[in-house]
A protein has these predicted regions:
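Acyl-donor-binding surface of acyltransferase catalytic domains
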Residues: 1-60, 161, 167, 183-187
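Short acidic/polar active-site loop segments enriched in Thr and Asp
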Residues: 24, 157, 177
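Ligand-binding pocket scaffold of soluble enzyme catalytic domains
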Residues: 60, 64-65, 102, 119-122, ...
């Protein structure tokens, strides 16, 4: 996988080279940034509902994470990513934190993770994923809230998100502003 930002130098030449080497463009995203304090101030009225969020701290916890991804993106190489995440948890990597939101019956319905090393000014929020039946019920916002709170506790002053078109309006309401465009390039290699 390769990420190409709109502000990268030689953007057009890089894009041409990636396409010539068999990489395919995925859907475009937007890099959005906000001050942690701005997001936290906008959240109290936005987060409500029956879901309970918790940090995922064990390899077994990430099975729930994969269930969410498999439901939302069937056929995607979810196991490859989740196995990498399991390895990072097993190695006690302090730079990545995983969260999930659970319905009252215990079903994992939303998830997200955060890259942040304590002391860094920016935390990158990634993987915001919600099962279809739980959309428009503040599940995505709940995942934003728990990660923003964790980033604040770890000393981050700003949050960054590589936002899909679906996420951008939610993020804008919480104070995020677009900074650049982003395109993912992926080369499919046969197993």
């Amino acid at each position: 996988m390769w990420k190409l930002y709109g502000h990268d130098r030689a953007h057009d030449a890089l894009r041409t080279a990636l396409l010539a080497r068999g990489f395919e463009e995925n859907d475009p995203s937007t890099l959005m940034v906000a001050a942690v304090d701005t997001v936290l101030a906008a959240l109290p009225a936005a987060v409500s509902g029956p879901l309970a969020a918790r940090q995922l701290t064990t390899v077994r916890d990430l099975d729930a994470y994969q269930q969410i991804w498999d439901d939302v993106w069937p056929g995607a190489p979810n196991a490859r990513y989740v196995n990498d995440y399991k390895s990072r948890i097993d190695q006690h990597d302090p730079g990545i934190l995983f969260y999930a939101g659970f319905a009252p019956d215990g079903e994992a319905v939303t998830s997200g993770y955060m890259f942040h090393h304590p002391g860094d000014p920016i935390a990158l929020l990634c993987g915001g994923t919600t099962k279809a039946a739980w959309r428009r019920q503040h599940a995505y916002t709940l995942m934003l809230a728990v990660r923003a709170q964790a980033a604040a506790k770890r000393g981050a002053s700003h949050l960054a998100v590589e936002a899909s078109p679906e996420s951008q309006p939610i993020l804008a309401r919480l104070g995020f502003e677009p900074l650049s465009t982003l395109m993912f390039y992926e080369k499919h290699i046969a197993d």
